[in-house]
């Protein structure tokens, strides 16, 4: 299949690849695993996430983006190369036009870094569109109308609020408090209250399954398994949605 254009939602936590007419074809964690001895990429996405926090000293698993922008250029380029190659398949010899998302407050230098990394990763042409615009289009909002529309986009590294009118962003604000901070808050809450250590994947699972910003009358529950900090042995607890609300209340 000849793919002319692809869209990449390049997030701090997860990356999504979109093909017109087919929708989302790739949804994987924004993580790259490296062999530190020879600087070789070992895994990207789901496979690399499995290595996070479990790798030996000679293997490093990194998130190459921070707060929605490139923190490690070389690693980001390798990751983009993987996602583009996976999307196109081995039989597609043509370079696609790639549209990449970026934060509302991205600087010209940060924009250029994303475009250059995308071109070096295998794109024929690369363009960056700010995330609030893409979120509005995805939600079916008429961005070219004269009336204002407020978009709240909560990602892994940043949460952005933007007002859109006449096809552009009139005003915006960005907070470096988003999904990853919620995961950290949940893990810290479990550690303090239950003396139980849990990893970021477990904390994320709790957030997704029973996450709530406010107390609920009908509480949701889930089992949380971790390591007892006194004995070092595995132990399970039952956590509810109101506890999650309490854990993230400071954010």
Label for each model-derived stretch:
Residues 1-154, 162-251:
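Nucleotide/phosphate-binding catalytic cleft detector across ATP-hydrolyzing
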Residues 159:
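Acidic, divalent-metal-coordinating active-site segment for phosphoryl/phosphodiester hydrolysis
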């Amino acid at each position: 299949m000849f793919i002319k254009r692809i869209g990449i939602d390049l997030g701090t936590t997860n990356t999504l690849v979109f093909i017109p007419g087919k929708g989302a074809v790739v949804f994987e964690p924004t993580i790259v695993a490296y062999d530190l001895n020879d600087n070789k990429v070992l895994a990207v996405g789901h496979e690399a996430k499995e290595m996070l926090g479990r790798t030996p000293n000679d293997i490093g698993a990194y998130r190459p983006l921070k707060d929605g922008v490139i923190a490690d250029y070389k690693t980001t380029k390798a990751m983009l190369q993987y996602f583009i190659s996976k999307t196109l398949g081995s039989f597609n010899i043509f370079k696609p036009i790639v549209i990449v998302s970026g934060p509302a407050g991205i600087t010209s230098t940060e924009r250029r870094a994303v475009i250059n990394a995308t071109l070096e990763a295998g794109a024929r042409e690369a363009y960056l569109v700010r995330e609030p615009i893409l979120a509005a289009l995805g939600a079916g909002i008429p961005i070219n109308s004269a009336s204002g529309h407020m978009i709240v986009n909560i990602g892994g590294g940043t949460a952005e609020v933007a007002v859109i009118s006449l096809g552009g962003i009139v005003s915006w604000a960005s907070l470096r408090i988003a999904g990853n901070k919620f995961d950290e808050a949940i893990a810290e809450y479990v550690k303090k209250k239950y003396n139980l250590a849990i990893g970021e994947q477990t904390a994320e699972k709790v957030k997704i399954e029973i996450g709530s910003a406010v107390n609920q009358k009908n509480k949701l529950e889930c089992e949380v398994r971790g390591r007892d900090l006194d004995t070092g042995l595995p132990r399970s607890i039952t956590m509810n949605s109101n506890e999650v609300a309490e854990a993230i209340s400071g954010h």
